[in-house]
Amino acid sequence: MSHVRIDKLQRQAGKGGYAVPHLLGSNIEMVLGHIRAAEDKQSPLALGFAPEVFSMIPLEVSLPMLVNAAKRAKVPVATQLEHGHDFDTIMQAIQLGVSSVMFDGSDLSYEENVKQTQEIVKVAHAFGVAVEGELGCVGGSA
């Protein structure tokens, strides 16, 4: 029950009329805190890791932490690589066990972005991994 695909959580939330929190986790304290709060509220949870935000933590350290914590959770938890900008990073995340990847090709032309997103979808789905694609840019900066 615990480690699930994000699209499953989204479909259930849509049918049930509720939202699923999607929180970033950069260290074990954050991850376990997010899961404990979700368990306390009996809420599903999506845990994400954004390499550009937490560049000091290698994927091979961060993603297994998220995946293993999700598997131990008492509520459904999806794990997602956020803003993967290239095929190799996406593949590494899939091999490390995440249930979802987000491909961010927003710096590419629209046509190239769609093409690469489609290629990633084929590979990811073969491994049972959900894909979110970023096909445009929202103005502003963080």
What annotation goes with each model-predicted range?
Residues 1-21:
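N-terminal amphipathic alpha-helix/helix-capping segment at the start of soluble metabolic enzymes
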Residues 41-43, 95-101:
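Glycine-enriched alpha-helix->loop->beta-strand junction motifs that scaffold or abut catalytic
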Residues 18-19, 49-56, 99-116, 142:
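Glycine-rich tight-turn/loop motif centered on a GG-T
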Residues 8, 30, 48-49, 53-96, ...:
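N-terminal active-site wall of soluble small-molecule enzyme domains
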Residues 3, 32, 55-63, 83-92, ...:
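Active-site-adjacent beta->alpha loops and helix N-cap segments on the catalytic face
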Residues 41, 73-75, 127:
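Helix C-cap/helix->beta junction micro-motif
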Residues 19-25, 45-49, 77-83, 101-103, ...:
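Hydrophobic faces of well-ordered beta-strands that scaffold small-molecule active sites
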